């Protein structure tokens, strides 16, 4: 049975440095996925994640459990990566190139966009990935956090600092843009709803 974040954090606050390593190991995979999507470069993401965990360690005594630890952590990852992208003069965009996104791509398309299409071919997967990457950054970030990271709307609000209504609108618009773009690329006519 694994320890809860609260138990691990309590041990860290009591001076057990090894427990911080346990906390990092527990969350680094998902944090890295988010960092790679934002920065689109594994090396930059690793550097940003190192900065993130230093910030987390320093701020841990002030963490108040108003949200889950993972939500708080993702907020720090998000802010650190957006800042890093800005310093490099790059536009903030999220990517679907990270390993393990195959199932997420299937879900994006089969559940929400074009329910009659089976996501079997690599060509179709490429189209989906390309169109998600073409989303305007404002829509792409909210959409990716919701669909790929499987965050709740409330968690996205906490991570990004964007109001709930705005998050909902951005996800809705992202889905609409994807539906149109994928249908156009696949030469399907959009059915009137």
Regions found by a protein language model. Give the residues of each.
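Sigma70-family region 2
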Residues: 13-14, 40, 53-68, 87-88
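N-terminal module of bacterial RNA polymerase sigma factors
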Residues: 1-30, 37, 116, 154-155, ...
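Arg/Lys-rich amphipathic alpha helix in sigma70-family domain 2
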Residues: 61-65, 75-96, 182-184
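Short, charged helix-capping/linker segments at alpha-helix termini
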Residues: 13-22, 32-51, 164, 187-188
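Internal acidic/polar
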Residues: 2, 91-118
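Structural recognition of an alpha-helix C-terminal capping motif at a helix-to-coil junction
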Residues: 33, 47-54, 67-79
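DNA-recognition helix of helix-turn-helix
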Residues: 82, 128, 139, 145-148, ...
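Amphipathic, Lys/Arg- and hydrophobic-enriched alpha-helical face
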Residues: 24-42, 59, 132, 181-184
